[in-house]
Amino acid sequence: MKSTGIKKQENGYEFYTPHYPPPVVVECQKDLSQYGIKGRYLDMTFSKLKQLGAPPEDKDAYNCALKYAVHLNEHIKSGKGLIMMGPVGTGKTSLAISILRRAIEQGYNGYLISMMSLLDTLLVLSKGPAEHYLKFENRIRNCPLLVLDDFGAEYDNKWVSSKVDSIISDRVERGKATIITTNLSVQKIKKCYDSRIYDRLKETSFILSFKGKSKRDPLDISQI
């Protein structure tokens, strides 16, 4: 049987050393669902945002969000978040997810969840084993970057208000960065929750206002 190795001679002996093909490096994509990114947002990145463009009247807000992403590492370390306010369809969630993707790429354990899902999950888990509830709530309270999508869309009751207040206050005190998207105005947020919730967020967040129309212009992401 003919050897496929490399023939060598040493001390009067002939032998073959194995010949292995060069290693093939396969890049494994992270399972984004573990960070709360699912469905139509799985391919959402800053490159995708560039293709989609931005409404002309929201260029300043988009540029501020891009600037936040450029300095993401320092913002996460200092607990500085973002509040993105405006009508449905202005790209707030897409921006938030693109920033979260950047954080994941930098090694941070971020998480995205809608407010409805957050509170539904807490309610369901509260009726089961305590360790499951505590594990989930611990992640919400302690992950370096939490994205709360559609803030204010959840049902209104005292338990919800107190739980939201508790989570946000805890994250502010721990110096954890939070990104919030909401269709509500400042006045409506203060009406839905204790005004202290918004005040706490305002102290530790950049606030961006979106106006939004369907027409979109090219988006410059060269700084990213």
Regions found by a protein language model. Give the residues of each.
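A short, basic N-terminal segment
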Residues: M1-D60, K67, I207-L208, G212, ...
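Short glycine-rich substrate-engagement loop in P-loop NTPases that contacts/grips substrate
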Residues: D58-N63, I104-N142
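Pre-Walker A adenine-sensing motif
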Residues: N63-I76
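Walker A/P-loop nucleotide-binding motif
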Residues: K77-A96
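P-loop NTPase Walker A phosphate-binding motif
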Residues: S94-Y108
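Loop/turn-to-beta-strand initiation segments
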Residues: Y108-N109, N142-L145, R174-I180
